[in-house]
């Protein structure tokens, strides 16, 4: 176990056939329906420097290949990470969703690391270039205040 991955909270109680793996065979992140034992989150991972850098280099190689082929994985880096995990069972320690607990969710786990809802702090669509309309810093703060403190 040279790597550290965390189970994606949206799939902790689902069977592998229902995981949202990339099912496009043209993509280097492709995972067939009969493969994969865990669905991992792309937001928290680590490991020994050698293992982590080797993983990063492999994921970079696959990403570049997909770009050359005009393919974008379903969940981008998370899809690539899941393919890597499926190909390397036993090479990583899988942490439970308690270490990647989304803000506002109710799951039967103790919250150890809370993942904040980024849309409360900035305009996600504008950052991803899906919208020309951006909210100011003050608008984001006001909306977060209203959501957290007003009835």
Task: Give the residues covered by each predicted segment.
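Conserved donor-nucleotide/metal-binding helix-loop-beta segment in metal-dependent transferases, i.e.
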Residues: 1-29
């Amino acid at each position: 176990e040279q790597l550290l991955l965390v189970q994606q909270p949206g799939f902790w109680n689902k069977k592998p056939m229902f995981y949202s793996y990339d099912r496009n065979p043209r993509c280097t992140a492709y995972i067939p329906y009969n493969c994969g034992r865990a669905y991992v989150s792309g937001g928290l991972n680590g490991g020994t420097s050698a293992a982590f850098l080797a993983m990063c280099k492999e994921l970079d190689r696959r990403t570049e290949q997909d770009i050359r082929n005009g393919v974008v994985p379903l969940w981008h880096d998370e899809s690539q990470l899941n393919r890597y995990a499926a190909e390397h069972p036993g090479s990583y320690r899988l942490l439970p969703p308690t270490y990647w607990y989304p803000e506002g969710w109710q799951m039967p786990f103790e919250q150890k690391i809370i993942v904040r809802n980024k849309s409360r702090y900035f305009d996600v669509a504008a950052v991803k270039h899906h919208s020309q309309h951006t909210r100011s810093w003050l608008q984001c703060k006001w909306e977060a205040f209203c959501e957290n403190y007003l009835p």
